Amino acid sequence: MAQYVQQLTVFLFQTWYTVNKKKWGLNMLKSWTPGEEPDKDEMKVQLEKTRNRLYDLQMKIKEHKLPVLVLFEGWSAAGKGSMIGKVIRNIDPRFFKVATMSAPTEEELRRPFLYRYMKQIPEEGKFTFLDSGWMEQTVKEVLNGELEGDAYERRIESIRRFERQLTDNGYLVLKFFMEIDKDEQEKRMKKLLSKDDTKWRVTGFDKWQNKHYKKCENVFDRYMKDTNMSSSPWYIIDAESKKWTELQVLEILTEGIDVALANNAMAVPILQNVFSMEKMPLLSEIPLDKTIGEDEYKKELKRLQNRLGE
C-alpha cells in the first residue's frame, strides 16, 4: 500500500507539472519563454481569486498538518523579498515564518552545508518562505571558482537527497526562480542606486552579476537542470511586471497546495534505522554472576574505544 501511495504521488505531480508547463512557461532557464500575461481586467479578477484561495487554504494546511517550504531564488533586483511580502499578506502571521539567508557565518561554515537551511524547515501545518537558499550559496561558490568537478557533483547529490527527504516525509517544496533580463536588471539597479535610502541594497556582487549576466545564466541553468525533480520542480517566474509576478506565484502556490492536500499522504516515510534491532532481554534474565579480568577488561575497552573513533 505504501509503495502504491508513493507511485500515485509521483504520478499526480508529474501530471500536474506537465499540464501546467505551457501555462506558466515552465522550462529550464536558457530555453524558457514567458507565459501569456492576462489583460488588466482579467489580472485583477484572477489576483483577487488566488489571494482569497490562499487565505482559505491556510486553515486546511493546519488541519491536515501539511508543512510547506517555499524557496525564492533568482536574479539580483528581481524582487524576491517584495514578492514574499505580497504573498504573506494573505496568511495569518501565526502560520508562517520568513528567513533571509545571508552569507554563512564562520560557525555555520564549520557545519554541514545544509545545516543552516535544515533549521528553517517549517513544522506541521505551517509555511516557511526562504529569501534565497541553497541555490544561491551553491552558484556563488561555482562563480567564485570554489566549487567544481567532483565537489560540485557531491553538492548537487546532497541537495537532491535533502529535497527528496523533505517530500518523502510529507513536505510540499516549491522552488521559484525570479527571471528578468539583463537590461531590466540594470535599470532596477540604477533606480535603487539613485536614492540614498535604497542604494545600500545593491552590492558589489549584484553589479558583477549584471556585468557577467551570460556567465551567471549558464551556471543558473546548469544548477536548475541538475536539481529539477518531479517531486520538487523548478518554476520560472516572469518577474518583469509586479502584478503578473504575483499572479504566477499565487497560482502555482495554491494549485500545489491543492494537489498536496488531495494526496494527503505525500510519500513513504524514510526508515530512520539502517541496522537490525535486537530484542533486549528482561532485567530478570540478565546474569549477574559474570566477571571479567582486569587485563581482558582493558583490552576490550581499548578495542571498543578505537572502534568508536572510527
Give short role names for the model-derived ranges.
Residues 4-8:
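Cationic, low-complexity basic patches in intrinsically disordered or flexible, solvent-exposed regions
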Residues 14-310:
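Glycine-rich phosphate-binding loop of ATP-dependent small-molecule kinases
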